[in-house]
Every structure is written in structure tokens, then in C-alpha cells.
Amino acid sequence: MASPVQVNPAGTLAQQALASAPEGMLIAPVWRRASAFVLDVLALSLLMHLLTGQRLLLTLADTSYLTGGPRFLASWAFSWALFMTGFWLYWKYTGRAYHRSLGQRAFRIALVHDDGTLLDDHHWGPRARSKLRYLVPVVGWFFAVRDLLRARSPGAEHRTAIDRAHHTVAAVDWSLPSETRIGLG
């Protein structure tokens, strides 16, 4: 029969959650994570804007398309679909190629499992889809602020909701074991 009393190991919840992490692995600071995300969004938005003849961002921001009739509404909806699909593809395939986005690479952030190993290819599609919530105007800001506050909290194991859902940790890349660093792009 199991005892009704359970003895937990010492340490904070964050220390217990990351107990399987390699010794010396550092969690990436929130400011780096936010800056990497902003860099990704600015760079890819600008690239897509230029590739669409400088119309994409103007169409996304123009709410008069909603009242201009079905043709304008379809154009507005297509622009949002193109915008979201572009980001999903970017995060999915840079994750598969480099095990992080280019913004995360610039800020020396690596996304790894709790034990410090690299993510497999099948993790990047769902993770990219989860990050799209931050791009939705107004609602995305709520999710972003909530997750940034969670990522600063030891009680939330210094993880965002996406990290917790996908069992990942955002670590500083130079603090990872050498066999993990070799696999990073």
C-alpha cells in the first residue's frame, strides 16, 4: 500500500523541473527571448512586404477592406493568411534547419528538451503554429505579456506556455553540452 506521505526533493519548483537538465545549462533571459521574437517579426514582415510589392502590411492594417465588399474582404483575408503562413513556414523550417529561428540564433538562444537534447523535426510544426498567437493584433499582445511574465517567474519554471506545452527550455547556447552545440545551426 502506498504511503499517504510523499517526500519531495529540496529546491524550488523550477529547480525540480530542470533537475534532468545538464549541469551548467543556463535559461535564456526574457529580454533575449523577446528581442529575438521582435527581430524575427520585423525582418520577416519587411521581407514579405517587399516581396508583395509593398502592399502586404498596408492591406493588413487597413480595416476599410472589411467594409469594401466581398472582393476587398477576400483580399484582406488572403493577406492575413499569407502573413500567418509565411511566419509558420519560417519558424517551422528554420527550426528544422538550425534548431532555432534566425533571431534566436542572433541572440544565442537554443530551444532544447528539458534534458538539454535537441528537438526532433516533428516538434517544430506544432511549436510554430503555437507562436502564431502572438501575431494576432490586440489578443496576441495579451498572450505575449502573459508569457513574458511567466518566463520571468520561478514558479512557472522560467517557461512560457508554449515551452510547457512542448516540453522545451530556451537555453543560452554556449551553456549547453558540446554534443548538443554541435547540432545547432
Regions found by a protein language model. Give the residues of each.
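Short, charged cytosolic
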Residues: 2-22
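Alpha-helical transmembrane segments of integral membrane proteins, especially early/N-terminal helices
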Residues: 2-6, 35-51, 183
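Membrane-water interface of alpha-helical transmembrane segments
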Residues: 23-26, 70-77, 127
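Juxtamembrane cytosolic face of transmembrane helices
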Residues: 25-35, 41, 90-104, 118-185
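Alpha-helical transmembrane segments of integral membrane proteins
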Residues: 31-36, 74-83, 126
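Hydrophobic alpha-helical transmembrane segments in multi-pass membrane proteins
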Residues: 41-53, 83, 87, 135-140
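Membrane-helix interface segments in multi-pass membrane proteins
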Residues: 48-84, 153-154
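Juxtamembrane inter-helical linkers in multi-pass membrane proteins
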Residues: 105-115
